[in-house]
Amino acid sequence: MTIINLKNINLTRNKKEILKDITWKVNPGENWVILGLNGSGKSSLLKLILAEEWKTSGEITVLNTQFGNGEIPKLRKRISVVGSFIAERFQPNIKAENLVYTGKFNSSMLYKPYTDQELDEARQLLRQMGAKSLIGRNYASLSQGEKQVLLIARSLILKPELLILDEATNGLDLFAKEKLLKQLQQINQLKTAPTLIYISHHPDEITDIFTHLLLLREGKVIQSGKKENLLNEKILTDFYQEKVEVHRFEQKYFVIPAN
């Protein structure tokens, strides 16, 4: 099964080219980072994958569902998305495990009390993620980093085949960001671990769990492939159109402007 297969995708909006001839394939066992500066087309690409926006031309297949020939509502139940845009949708007094279980219904509201058996599933997931300390706490009492961990747990309650993290560390301080990245490592070790697509403009967030990298600039794929083949000064200088230095420290990559 192919996770994502985009062929010659173009997206035009108000006579402006947003995405230009995008071809990209994600296979099982691969975790990808989409790296690009603001305005590169990352969000538009995400909307196409989620069928929230329609391509101008090209072919899109996600989890073996070809857009135009498959059932999109069923496909959406197999995909989870985490982004800062979701964080403000929840009631401040909702308990952590209740919030996690709302993911079963793709809702931000608690329409009925959940049973202990239902909530035990949410609690067990939080324990597996190393987030046992969040159980029983109100959403409003959590830090930004803890809220993001909770939202990721919520996204996993349906056991999705594809998990997309859209700028998941936005608004997090240094320590919260590092903790969140470690949480992703734990998720990757779950028996039901989904394929990860991580959208970012920070190279230092590319950890060892990610196998591949797609470099997006001004709506075009500049390079794509195994991360170790792309995270070097020659390719990234070409990508950023500014001379950069690439340093690796403790299995992380740091890109800085060259003197």
Curated annotation (Swiss-Prot):
GO MF annotations in UniProt: ATP binding; ATP hydrolysis activity
Domain ABC transporter: 4-243
Annotated S-S bridges: none
Keywords: ATP-binding, Nucleotide-binding, Transport
Protein name according to UniProt: Uncharacterized ABC transporter ATP-binding protein YmeB
SMART domains listed in its UniProt record: AAA (SM00382)
Gene3D superfamilies: P-loop containing nucleotide triphosphate hydrolases
Domain of life: Bacteria
UniProt family annotation: Belongs to the ABC transporter superfamily.
Residues at which ATP binds: 36-43
PROSITE patterns: ABC_TRANSPORTER_1, ABC_TRANSPORTER_2
Species, as recorded: Lactococcus lactis subsp. lactis (strain IL1403)
CDD domains the record matches: ABC_ATPase
